Amino acid sequence: MKPQPTQPAASQRLLSLDALRGFDMLFIMGFATLVVNVCHIFPGDVSAAVAESMSHPAWHGFSHHDTIFPLFLFIAGISYPFSLAKQRSLGATQGDLYRKILKRGALLILFGLIYNGLFRLDWPMRTASVLGRIGLAWALAAMLFLNFRTRTRIGIVGAILVGYWSLLALVPAPDAPAGADVYSMEGTIVGYIDRLLLPGKLHNKIFDPEGLLSTVPAVATAMLGMLTGEFVRLSEQRLSGNRKALYIALAAVAFTLVGILWDLSFPINKKLWTSSFVCVVAGYSLGMFALFYWIIDVKGYKGWVLPFQVIGLNSITIYMAQRIVDFKGISAFFFGGLAAKMPEALAPVVASTGYLLVSWLFLYFLYKKRIFLKV
């Protein structure tokens, strides 16, 4: 049977987004560990490089693991124009839209605090979090998207990226050690703002990778996703799905090149969320979305999507569950005996495969029961 393309209506959910979100989250639910363990079986330069890409660089630099967080935020951005169109079609007022944005942002911040151990009552606790940054960056971007037209939104993204670069380059931390580089952990104004204003513990004592000032360029990441979603919503009469995918792919190349060139003066750094990092991960995110969108929504090849869709529809659930549910213990109960009988090199592969399978089956159970955590 020939695959059927399904161009989305103005407010329809994109299946490619659920699949891409699931692919992204797959790496934090055990797949990255599995890749590393498989690479250890086949020693060599290529395997070593692949394994290294499954972890974050110490400071400057870029790896695949650096793409997971910003891709999720970018996808949240793509979704918003579709959600906004649906809300407006149901008669939502401007006040309703503001309340929904604030509610979602606040819930994500709350989930971030819970993830960090809110209920342990161990004070002071770390208040910055991945979910908290998503909540703040997405909510601020949504407010801007709601109140400005496309050209102004693009201008805001440019102003954020150039302004952030200028600030970090020209304003070092007042308490920086003598000779400290303005882009170092000790010398950057980003860490100083965290030490001055961010309540609770900092992740690295003097710096937090999900701190306050570095959330500002993350707003640009979310906004770029929203601009992409707005572009995809253009009617088929104005622009075909094939052309949309092509233009998004070309934009991916352009952003990647800009990021690589910008790295010469403003290093690519996830922890600082530098403007060059924003551009490079925008390139990656646009490229991955173009691929998934073209295959799934334009060409209609959907038979392979379910494993990723199961994850993508409950992405916040699995993120929180990794912290709350003892998947490692459950996996050891079912797969520990088999892993123990494997050769030494294969045992970690069996264990990590079991962990990934248990995590996925948990989500599949929720999927079959139609239980989804919606924020």
Which stretches of residues belong to each language-model region?
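Alpha-helical transmembrane segments and their immediate juxtamembrane cytosolic regions
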Residues: M1-V375
